[in-house]
């Protein structure tokens, strides 16, 4: 899924768990992708390209069991929950951040071709909806999702514009008929990974900047019945 729409998922997390600060939530929704970038640059995971790259379906996420397998994401989310909920004694934060981490693989399963493994060491079967086999439809669906996140969050028009413009900016990557610099990525998967890393950062910064004034930073703003972390009382 386009990085800006993963970033937009943070808006849903804030709507459900408003007591969690903006930066940890933004980092959590893209933690899986940060690992993917690092593992590709280090050669631990492998991305390949067709001799000519015209759109995203000419780039193949050939081997990514450590960052993008279902089991690896579950372990990563549980680790985040244990560290935050148990060691830092912030159970609501831990739950929110674990859900944020898990959201990444859920959204990728909804859009990717069959390139997501069940677990490291299990190469088959691989999972994905296959939506990226029809790139323009994928971009349309992704953009709708980003706009829906904005609507649930009740964000500003500037935030909406950021989400829409980031998606439109990716149009050459989703539409082979629209000229763009994507052809330069042929045979250069590590450059592709580095570009994705930069794109992630820009997306997170943009969403964070334009959402910050409406970010629900007080647990008192949580929906009725939602748990909130409270400071411990001495002697209890």
Q: Where are each of the predicted segments found?
A:
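N-terminal membrane-targeting hydrophobic helices
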Residues: 1-236
């Amino acid at each position: 899924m386009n990085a800006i729409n993963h970033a937009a998922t943070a808006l849903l997390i804030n709507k459900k768990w408003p007591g969690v600060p903006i930066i940890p939530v933004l980092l959590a929704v893209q933690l899986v992708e940060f690992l993917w970038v690092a593992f590709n640059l280090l050669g631990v995971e492998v991305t390949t390209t067709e001799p000519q790259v015209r759109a995203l379906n000419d780039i193949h996420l050939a081997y990514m069991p450590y960052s993008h397998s279902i089991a690896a994401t579950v372990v990563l989310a549980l680790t985040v929950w244990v560290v935050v909920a148990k060691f830092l004694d912030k159970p609501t934060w831990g739950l929110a951040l674990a859900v944020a981490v898990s959201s990444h693989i859920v959204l990728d399963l909804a859009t990717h071709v069959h390139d997501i493994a069940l677990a490291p060491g299990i190469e088959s079967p691989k999972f994905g909806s296959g939506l990226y086999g029809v790139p323009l439809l994928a971009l349309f669906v992704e953009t709708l999702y980003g706009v829906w996140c904005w609507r649930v969050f009740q964000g500003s028009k500037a935030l909406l514009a950021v989400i829409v413009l980031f998606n439109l900016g990716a149009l050459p990557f989703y539409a082979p008929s629209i000229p763009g610099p994507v052809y330069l990525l042929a045979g250069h998967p590590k450059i592709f990974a580095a570009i994705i890393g930069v794109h992630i950062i820009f997306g997170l910064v943009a969403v964070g900047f334009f959402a910050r004034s409406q970010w629900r930073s007080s647990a008192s703003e949580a929906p009725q019945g939602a748990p909130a972390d409270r400071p411990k009382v001495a002697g209890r």
